[in-house]
Amino acid sequence: VIAKIANVKHHLWIGTADIKDLYVKSSSMTVPFLKVISRLIERGVEVRLIHAKEPGPNFRKDFDDYSILAKRLERVLCPRVHFKMVIFDLETAYVGSANLTGAGLGMKGERNRNFEAGVLTNAPSFVEQAINQFDFVWNGSQCKKCGRKRFCPDSPLKY
């Protein structure tokens, strides 16, 4: 999944309950995942991120190292998000249990990684359902009736 992210051409949509200062392999180096994302944005890729809670200080430090992220990363915080998905160029989708963390998709050692399961497919009906679920949250379709509005700083709706 991480290797596929680096090759996205136009659209990358990521949904995760938890996000941390994830590190990944890039060529022969280990780099912050946010460096990979910043490179995509520099190439003109639209990157959308939905996550459920504010990341910790290490993530924020990495985020601040790449100024393009503050300007062009499209981001929504929704405390009700528990899905984990990555949509690649609106043609392929990963849906599974792995959060955007070292133990989920990153480089934690074999003895410390989580046991994850997921599906990576380009089956049109599966990808369409993933896109629809992502859009449902992204567009604020549930916000008006949501019981957790007070915890949601990014709702697109004004109450």
Put a short name on every predicted segment:
Residues 76-80, 112:
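Short solvent-exposed loop/turn micro-motifs enriched in small/polar/acidic residues
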Residues 92-159:
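Signature of lipid phosphatidyltransferase scaffolds
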Residues 72-74, 142:
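Conserved beta-strand segments of alpha/beta enzyme cores
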Residues 11, 91-92:
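Structural motif
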Residues 3-70:
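Primarily the HKD phosphodiesterase
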Residues 50-52, 78, 88, 95-96, ...:
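Generic beta-sheet signal
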Residues 84-87, 117-119:
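Short beta-strand scaffold segments in enzyme catalytic cores
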Residues 62-72, 148-157:
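Short, electropositive alpha-helical surface patch
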